[in-house]
Amino acid sequence: MKFLNPTALIATLGLAATLPVLAATKAEQEAEYYPISTLPVPEGVVLEAGAIQVLPHQRIAVSTRLGEIWFVDNAFDKDPSKAKFSRFASGLHEVLGLTTRGDGWIYATQRGELTRIKDTNNDGRADLFETVADSWGINGDYHEYAFGSKFDRDGNIWVILCLTGSFTSENPYRGWALRITPEGKTIPTTSGLRSPGGIATNHLGDLFYTDNQGPWNGTCWLKHLKPGGFVGNPTGNRWYEKAANMGPRPKDPTSNSRIPIERAKIPEFVPPAIGFPYNKMGQSASGIQNDGTAGKFGPFQNQLFVGDQTWSTVMRVYLEQVNGVYQGACFPFREGFDSGTLSLELASDGTMFVGGTDRGWGARGGKPFALQRLNWSGKTPFEIHEMHVKPDGFELTFTEPVDPETAGKVESYQFRTFTYIYQANYGSPEVDATTPPIESVTVAADGRSVRLKTALNLGHLHELKPTGVRSKSGRPLLHPLAYYTLNEIPR
């Protein structure tokens, strides 16, 4: 993550009067489909929500960056003012993961350990704390965050560990993903992490995490945590000496290169699945949630939603596997949250809880913290639903039929590609930009999909702006923007 004061930037560009108005207009448009409601936090409570867990009986648990866990009753009530807060636990260390499995324990990922917590005398306060695993290191550096997953399909909790600062790994497994088994055994699983911001499974049960711009990360990414894989930053690879199950240490990448070039040299290299272009989609990718609500959150079943802490937004992600490798497209989804989006939790009834904080990096939302809800209104926005790669271009599907005249025009689409330098230095500008012409457009008979024939660039992000496309009823796209990350071309 890298702090950039958006207010100062706007003032520098001379857009202070116009940009907030435009942003408010977009948020108002989005609110027709996905309204935001705010749960009022009691005075004196600093609820920087690091993690959220849905509990039975309309209750949620919320952990804070100050080491507390709060219960929120009536969290789903139509009237958010009826929410009631009670402190369950305190004295913990920046809890960035919460999960349960119906046995009375709450599992909390702290900076230095995975802990399970219980209220044994039913007085509403935790009184039993047990260490499940503490096999990684911590030395007090601000950057040594630890994020924890929900239980995976095998009953494991995954812990993803930030590096020490941006450039070193001073303690065991900093820059790694670890699996903690139900018995408390630690299994080093994936190397090459830098600065995680969130972790979750997709609908197939595979684990993904967000990583942030910095050394070896030209931008913010969504990456697949493939067991045995290396995801790009070699700083923590010194700990292969402690991870016999992982095999030999991968070859170090060459700086000032490109990901496809280094991937060809390093068999363990798992390329980023999704790139979030810096200062276009956001600046600090954070929490992740899969939509498994069977339509209760709208038309995006089995897609992922990803927060951005600096921009106070939630983005949308469509993933596909091509030649066995994950890749796909990201889209804007919802802006206008009160603080920096950090934690997401999507309940089975279609309520998405969004926890916010601005400490450390600042946020557009403007408030130091917030706990909010996002719900689907029942109205379907006109959006690109999915973006599939084909051997000769892309296929777009839409949430409603398109107008064949506007959707069938080449002029309705703007298209370019670019990539990032893969380097040890911090971040990267966009490089190697191309503007391949769209050779032809074919609209399906039912109007639900469009085929774009165009050249593809391996390892590039493909930026598509279908600003001229209208729905059959004449509506423009709510978000006429997509970025497809191309790791593989279909054979």
Summary of predicted features, one role per range:
Residues 24-381, 385-393, 404:
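Beta-propeller domains with acidic blade repeats across secreted/periplasmic ectodomains
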Residues 1-6:
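Positively charged n-region of N-terminal signal peptides that target proteins for export
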Residues 484-491:
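Flexible, low-complexity linkers/stalks enriched in Thr/Pro that connect modular domains
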Residues 7-20:
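Bacterial N-terminal signal peptides
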Residues 392-396, 450:
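Structural beta-strand segments of beta-rich domains
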Residues 396-440, 464-471, 480-484:
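Short, surface-exposed alpha-helix to beta-strand junction/turn motifs within ectodomains of secreted
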Residues 455-461:
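Surface-exposed, short loops/turns at beta-strand junctions within beta-sandwich domains
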Residues 442-446:
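Blade-terminus and WD-like Trp-Asp/Gly-His loop motifs, strongest in beta-propeller folds
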